[in-house]
UniProtKB/Swiss-Prot annotation:
GO terms for molecular function: carbohydrate transmembrane transporter activity. It comes from the Bacteria. It is found in: Cell membrane. The chain crosses the membrane at residues 4-21, 26-48, 52-71, 84-106, 110-132, 151-173, 178-195, 208-230, 234-253, 260-279. Keywords: Cell membrane, Membrane, Sugar transport, Transmembrane, Transmembrane helix, Transport. Disulfide bonds: none annotated. This is Putative sugar uptake protein BC_0219. InterPro entries: Sugar_transport. The keyword Transmembrane helix applies. Belongs to the GRP transporter (TC 2.A.7.5) family.
Amino acid sequence: MDILLALLPAIAWGNILLVSVKMGGGAYSQTVGMTIGALFFATIMYVFTQPALTMTILIVGFISGLFWALGQVNQLKTVEKLGVSTTVTISTGMQLVATSIFGVIAFREWTTTTTIILGTIAILLIVVGVVFTSLDDKENAQPPGQLKKGLLTLIVSTFGYLVYVIIIRWYNIDGWSAILPQAVGMFVGAVVLTSKHKPFNKYAIRNALSGLLWGTGNLFLLLSLPRVGVATSFPLSQTGIVISTFGAIVFLGEKKTKRQLIFIALGSVLIIGGAVLLGMTKA
């Protein structure tokens, strides 16, 4: 039962991009819509849990949310260039590598020979997985420069997600306390980043559903952490890439050749394998 609970964040987060694309709209209205849903969810959660909110929690949580908005809007812009199935695997891989390297440098996470070996193998697996999932095929090649533009946009996205995660940990703020300030920062950040593109339309309202999914995934992660621990919950939460990747191919009709499907499957397995090894370094 506890493992099932730990899998629920992956199910929720794995469906976010699928729902966003299905709801329609561009990256800007999708991002604003997600933050509307997330803010609504966070407000409800705060009413029921009422964690203590110090000035540090309010400021740091707000800043964290701003950077989440930077990460999300650029991830969705990449989806427009590369599609969900390619974007989500590369993005997940980049985030895992970035947070792991920063964790080693800033928090001295890998302090034993075993964790150094496991962590190094994990990063290599993830990097190879990212390369596999981004391979083009002559029959289904991206337009010239499209992959490069997408990767550059994902680097900005990864930076946003990295700060979103790291700043909360740097100030040792627990997830329950951070939810509401983060959601406020997410909404404000989304509005600031998208205001020139008139994001408030029917698609923004529709995409509130994806924001509710984000909040639901967050809730289940917080509930599962004390039950199964970080070493188990962390890699399980990353398995959502399987849902996103193959859901995009099956339900969104993204076209892939047989060769691409094989490499996407292998890449996804390698990235999840890397996430499992990273989870072991946190045990």
